[in-house]
A protein has these predicted regions:
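Glycine-rich phosphate-binding loop and adjoining helix at the ATP-binding site
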Residues: 15-16, 22-85, 124
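Glycine/GP-enriched mid-protein hinge/lid loop-to-helix segment characteristic of carbohydrate kinases
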Residues: 56, 62, 77-146
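Short glycine-rich anion-binding loops that position phosphate/pyrophosphate groups of nucleotides
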Residues: 21-24, 92-94
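A broad structural signal for short, well-ordered beta-strand segments within beta-sheet-rich domains
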Residues: 13-15, 135
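N-terminal phosphate-binding loop and adjacent alpha-helix
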Residues: 1-12
Length: 146
């Protein structure tokens, strides 16, 4: 975070758009709004990433999931420009998806954790999966780490 803060302080920026891996708390009424919550990435668990940035910058800071930020970027500047309904899926250390429906980012009680959808394994597949929460969800079976 120190390197990120120093980088942005060395530039004349007017706002920041923070697309963050999760799970994150997007509920503006929650006491942990802006936190990375119960992530398997132990060094980031319960980290107030938005509050840390706000403590260093007195500018507008947008906050959403990394995949929603990517979906919005594609709909604004990229291959989905001008399209109102967009689904952006990424496969890496996890599996994530961001979505726009009628031009609006999808949110709910939490953000959609599409990588944690349960899928049926082949009966002969004995791999237990790597997701620390569900083991054999989509992310646990098909992410880069799996």
């Amino acid at each position: 975070m120190d390197e990120i803060i120093n980088f942005f302080k060395s530039h004349d920026i007017k706002s920041i758009g923070l697309g963050c891996f999760g799970p994150i708390d997007l509920n503006t009424n929650s006491p942990t709004y802006g936190h990375i919550t119960n992530t398997p990435k132990q060094a980031w668990k319960n980290y107030n990433i938005l509050g840390t940035l706000k403590g260093h910058f007195n500018i507008p800071i947008g906050f959403d999931t990394d995949v929603n930020a990517a979906a919005l970027g594609e709909a604004t500047f990229g291959s989905a420009k001008g399209i109102k309904n967009v689904l952006y899926i990424t496969v890496g250390t996890g599996i994530g998806a961001g979505a726009l429906v009628n031009g609006e980012l999808v949110h709910g009680l939490l953000h959609p954790e599409m990588g944690h959808i349960f899928i049926r394994k082949h009966p002969d597949d004995l791999f237990p999966g790597i997701c620390p929460y569900h083991h054999d969800c989509l992310e646990g079976l098909a992410s880069g780490k799996a």
